[in-house]
Amino acid sequence: MKKLIELFTIQSNARDERRMRSYVCKQLQRMGLAYSVDAHGNIITHKGAGVRPFVVCHIDTVHDFVKHFEIKLQTNKRGTFLYGWDSANVQQVGCGGDDKAGIYACLHALNKLDNVSAVFFSREEVGCVGSKNIALDVFRDASMILQADRKGAADFINYSNGVELYGDDFKRVALPIADLYGYKEARGLCTDAGELCARHVGVACVNLSAGYYNAHTDNEIQCVEELESVCALIVDLCRAIGGSAHSFTPSPMFLPSYSRQSYWDWDMDIWDAPHTDRRAQLPTSTPCALCYSVVGANAPIFNVCQSCYDDNVTFGTFSHLEFMRLCQEV
């Protein structure tokens, strides 16, 4: 628990990842692992040799830095939860479970496994910058790519913004293991695993629930037990099926992602990301009508975030007009 709180206490966002990058590098040094940092700020480390699983995460969050930032604990019948606290203003702030949980999972895998690689991506929250620009040759010995960058406790993501992440062969061997932890297939939105698959990295990828909730908001919380569960699942997947390559290339299809055409170009939760042209288009903000994450006030037609739109329309059962009427009634 001490290590987890130490990690969560570090503040990092796309404008300033230096503290988190330094922390990760120090942890790798303590494990005696060699690592490299590429031109885009991605941290890459290999342990072992030959074909091996890759575990990936991103080192930025969406949250502004808080001068008097603390991590607090609260325990209830569901488990132990971490949350961020601004002690100066006496109010809750985002803890950054998205994706500090993934960082923890990567470090855990490196500690537990003898043959594994890890990549800590830069600036995922402003368009998957790290995974979009990393040299794919880094993954030449990958058997599969696992990421823990999903809300909740039970999602085994098979589509990321319309990109299929793995095929039937991987599904046949991986899902029985995931089922032991209560994980079921689900569709998700953009993250590094999806970006790599869209770039034809060549192996099966999957994104897993990491036990955080209310991501990208001041109400974000992290369930410790659910994070420990996904860490154990990742280790079991790596040990059971990580020794042989699970080749996969997605079929060409429309990709509603950050930098591609979508209902609107970017998720509207990019707040004041370092893209001044985008910032100029988002002069004010308002909570999403459904999940209350922050969206641009000038979002087309109605104020919902891309996640809610995709969950209900792109991958859901509502038509655009039906969903528009629903949001107007909320």
Q: Model-flagged regions — what are they?
A:
Residues 295-300, 313:
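Short functional micro-motifs and their immediate structural scaffolds
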Residues 214-281:
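His/Asp/Glu-rich mid-to-C-terminal helical/loop segments that flank catalytic regions of hydrolases
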Residues 89-168, 181, 185, 193:
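Acidic/histidine-rich catalytic neighborhood of metal-dependent amide-processing enzymes
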Residues 49-115:
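Active-site metal-coordination/substrate-binding segment of hydrolases
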